[in-house]
UniProtKB/Swiss-Prot annotation:
It comes from Bacillus subtilis (strain 168). This is 2-succinyl-5-enolpyruvyl-6-hydroxy-3-cyclohexene-1-carboxylate synthase. Homodimer. Pfam families: TPP_enzyme_C, TPP_enzyme_M_2, TPP_enzyme_N. Binds 1 thiamine pyrophosphate per subunit. Keywords: Magnesium, Manganese, Menaquinone biosynthesis, Metal-binding, Thiamine pyrophosphate, Transferase. SUPFAM superfamilies: DHS-like NAD/FAD-binding domain, Thiamin diphosphate-binding fold (THDP-binding).
Amino acid sequence: MTVNPITHYIGSFIDEFALSGITDAVVCPGSRSTPLAVLCAAHPDISVHVQIDERSAGFFALGLAKAKQRPVLLICTSGTAAANFYPAVVEAHYSRVPIIVLTADRPHELREVGAPQAINQHFLFGNFVKFFTDSALPEESPQMLRYIRTLASRAAGEAQKRPMGPVHVNVPLREPLMPDLSDEPFGRMRTGRHVSVKTGTQSVDRESLSDVAEMLAEAEKGMIVCGELHSDADKENIIALSKALQYPILADPLSNLRNGVHDKSTVIDAYDSFLKDDELKRKLRPDVVIRFGPMPVSKPVFLWLKDDPTIQQIVIDEDGGWRDPTQASAHMIHCNASVFAEEIMAGLTAATRSSEWLEKWQFVNGRFREHLQTISSEDVSFEGNLYRILQHLVPENSSLFVGNSMPIRDVDTFFEKQDRPFRIYSNRGANGIDGVVSSAMGVCEGTKAPVTLVIGDLSFYHDLNGLLAAKKLGIPLTVILVNNDGGGIFSFLPQASEKTHFEDLFGTPTGLDFKHAAALYGGTYSCPASWDEFKTAYAPQADKPGLHLIEIKTDRQSRVQLHRDMLNEAVREVKKQWEL
């Protein structure tokens, strides 16, 4: 009787992933991927999350890896199944999230000969993956078992090496595909990890930073801009640096510097609104900017930095690459944020720096927020109030996942700094509106804590399939559906002036009744008519297992003018108080 080599070959493959610290596999049903799926399910150190739809599965894995900050296996059968991972792989590439894609494939003799469910899977994801290989067909020799273990270690290491990102291993398999679980699939040839891949913090010596340190020591008018941050230590060190330099921090919501129990005295949270005013920009123009992480959501900040090349920009990016869409940076420094902050602070003199510059920013920010609160609309159709109310209701130590298009921009505008500890997530790599529901589900599974998802109606429609995870896994997900019946962001863009074709090409109303989606996936549903009703609907459900859908119906046309009028009035009041 011929021994099927799949059991020990794929068993060694999966076991080495577990030895590399991987604890989760997202698996899509399929025949050719049987040994990968079954041996993941049988491994005592790997949790399997079954997702039926491959596109949703890809984004679920993305959210899971984003929450855990370590690689997740993503497994599917051969054919178009793998192609459905493409959007999630692209997002993982640009947001630097480690995913290990394992695509089962037909053996070489069945490729390019018209065999069913066989497509060319070589380099399927192009340059969006950091590493690709087509593994050898299963053999049970000691040499081949060492080979497949080494390949697993390498794939895990490549995914975690900075900048982190997706990798792809194509796995050709011959029938029979069912492994023999009674034959010690993980024990044979387990003599320890054959390749131990370690990554560390990227550092830079003080001498290399001498010119930057000297510039910062002399520049009193500076500011710190923070994009998405992952490390609490980095946050604390950036705050310490801002206090030492007396620089304001323009904190993107994804920096998570606006929320939490840390010191927020130097954090500025209303900049996206008041930096739209040219006079305020002139009064608050810095000589130097230190930017940590990717470019923030705020378009006014981006345009300000892009259009004024005389501002000295210092970009700190530990992961390498070139994240500077302004094309105006003077210094690109590839080192850890905490290392940079500590080195700069160590070189500062003990002399007390003037706080006048920082106080200007604090004054404008404080007056703007105060005035905006006095003119807020009680109309439930005004979306801005949602975020000001929600930030005080999100359960502590839970997560807030924010959809792209208008939701993340409204969070940037209306989300104030406050002490409630929770984490904000969003898919800002490629900024797509697809896969957002599934990404939020993955974060929920990864954190083992409730998630509140704020999402627009078109984005919600894109990923309705993702809601199945809430029902199957009992995930505590509250979806706040901001339904303006179409693409609300286009009403703020020049396309809105094209009246003849605007609704058909850009507004794209669907007219869908989303309460049926809640029923389909066994969730609760409410559609509050006031903000008091919203609070009553949200608070009791936010940390309970299952799907809870709260629909906020808004009006695209009226919100544009109301939004602009409110912000313009607040800016006018600030300028009056500042005697501009």
